[in-house]
């Protein structure tokens, strides 16, 4: 395997949408308005400083993850998805790490994640990289029931 991590390229835009749509729908049954808005406004997100990373092997996308600025020096790590049809050991962790580094390199002092407590593999990645669970009064997504942050960047 000759996997490499690359920043957004137009030819992988649909993979970003498809991997995340597949993952969200297979786990929760439907996309939310916030998901659709993110997919429709990729260019606007990137103009605001966001970046989408891909793990790629021989021009095939394996996994993807987005890092986007929120308020002040807080950035969200989101839309971690993968290609179910291709074996990809470590691809999710690799794009997650690249997204964290992008945010840090662009002024993040705090990283933030909204997730769901049933997603054990994703929760493992967050904990592996030092994220700590936090309590929120409300969540941006109906499916969101757990949140994490990391401040020791």
Annotate each predicted stretch with a short phrase.
Residues 60, 83-97, 104-106, 111, ...:
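Conserved glycine-rich acetyl-CoA-binding loop
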Residues 2-4:
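Extreme N-terminal starter segment of soluble prokaryotic enzymes
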Residues 7-85, 96-98, 102, 135-140, ...:
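Acetyl-CoA-dependent GNAT
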């Amino acid at each position: 395997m000759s996997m490499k991590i690359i920043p957004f390229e137009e030819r992988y835009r649909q993979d970003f949408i498809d991997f995340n749509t597949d993952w969200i729908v297979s786990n929760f049954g439907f996309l939310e308005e916030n998901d659709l808005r993110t997919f429709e406004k990729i260019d606007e997100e990137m103009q605001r400083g966001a970046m989408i990373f891909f793990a790629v092997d021989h021009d095939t996308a394996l996994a993807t993850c987005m890092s986007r600025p929120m308020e002040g020096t807080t950035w969200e790590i989101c839309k971690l998805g993968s290609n179910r049809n291709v074996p990809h050991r470590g691809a999710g962790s690799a794009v997650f790490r690249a997204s964290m580094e992008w945010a840090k390199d662009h002024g993040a002092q705090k990283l933030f994640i909204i997730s769901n407590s049933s997603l054990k593999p994703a929760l493992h990645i967050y904990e592996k990289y030092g994220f700590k669970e936090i309590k929120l009064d409300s969540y941006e997504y109906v499916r969101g029931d757990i949140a994490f942050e990391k401040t020791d960047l």
